[in-house]
């Protein structure tokens, strides 16, 4: 049976925390392998990340905080790792991360592979480390060979498993996995799944992260304009079909980018009848 996992971002208000509590409690009924919580640009939400993770853990569920290294010193990261260890956390999602708006590149880590190596150097095998990978290539990647090479650097540094950027073309995932296997990488590569709720928001996210919205899907979504119900129905059908194809093709599980909403991710998972 395939695994699932669900990603949140830390809320900024008491109302947001209450809403997120209802979200993860609903998704917990689906028995996920773990929940994860993002870290904010430049680590800007690190306290909220830890608070969210610990609340989920206190309810008896596995939760993994993200940790990013952009704009961070080794001392910063060492202190954050110690906070996680002191709280019994053993599962991390390690990323380079994004700079806060208006800041130039800084910090002592250039790549996510450097962060993974530092975690292993300072913490040994304490943490299970998830990393990111990009079947449709990172926006800064120059060519296909570089994408696999960069991913291999993270694996060689000590990554245990990987979560992909979201995509809507299953063939991109299968091709990327084949390239990774040919390069000797055997770790689990779990597809990231983005439910579709709002086309303009999705287009903005996709332009920023390099995820392609296939032409047929883009035109279909554009035709619905502001018809939220039609977009939701189409999105459920399209993303559910994508997930079915991924699992049938051997994907080890699915990681849902929930945007702190339970309904669509839960409905897609239930449609898969797993």
Model features per residue range: what roles?
Residues 15-17, 43-55, 73-79, 98-119, ...:
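Active-site-adjacent beta->alpha loops and helix N-cap segments on the catalytic face
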Residues 3-19, 41, 63-75, 128-146, ...:
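Active-site mouth loops of central-metabolism enzymes
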């Amino acid at each position: 049976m395939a695994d699932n996992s669900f990603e949140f971002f830390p809320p900024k208000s008491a109302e947001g925390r209450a809403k997120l509590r209802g979200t993860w409690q609903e998704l917990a009924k689906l028995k996920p392998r773990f929940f994860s919580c993002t870290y904010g640009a430049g680590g800007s939400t690190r306290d909220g990340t830890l608070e969210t993770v610990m609340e989920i853990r206190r309810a008896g569920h596995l939760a993994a905080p993200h940790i990013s290294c952009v704009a961070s010193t080794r001392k910063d990261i060492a202190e954050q790792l110690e906070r996680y260890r002191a709280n019994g956390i053993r599962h991390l999602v390690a990323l380079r991360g994004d700079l806060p708006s208006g800041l130039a590149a800084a910090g002592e880590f250039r790549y996510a592979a450097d962060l993974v190596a530092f975690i292993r150097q300072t913490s040994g095998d304490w943490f299970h480390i998830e990393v990111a990978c990009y079947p449709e290539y990172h926006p800064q990647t120059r060519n296909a060979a570089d994408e696999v090479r960069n991913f291999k650097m993270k694996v060689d540094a000590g990554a245990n498993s990987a979560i992909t950027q979201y995509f809507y073309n299953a063939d991109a995932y299968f091709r990327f996995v084949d390239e990774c296997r040919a390069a000797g990488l055997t770790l689990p590569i779990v597809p990231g799944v983005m439910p579709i709720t709002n086309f303009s928001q999705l287009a903005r996210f996709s332009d920023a992260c390099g995820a392609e919205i296939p032409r047929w899907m883009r035109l279909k979504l554009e035709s619905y304009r502001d018809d939220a119900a039609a977009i939701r129905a189409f999105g459920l059908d399209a993303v559910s079909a994508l997930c079915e194809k991924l699992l049938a093709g051997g994907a080890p599980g699915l990681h849902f980018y929930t945007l702190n909403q339970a309904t669509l991710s839960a409905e897609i998972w239930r449609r898969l009848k797993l």
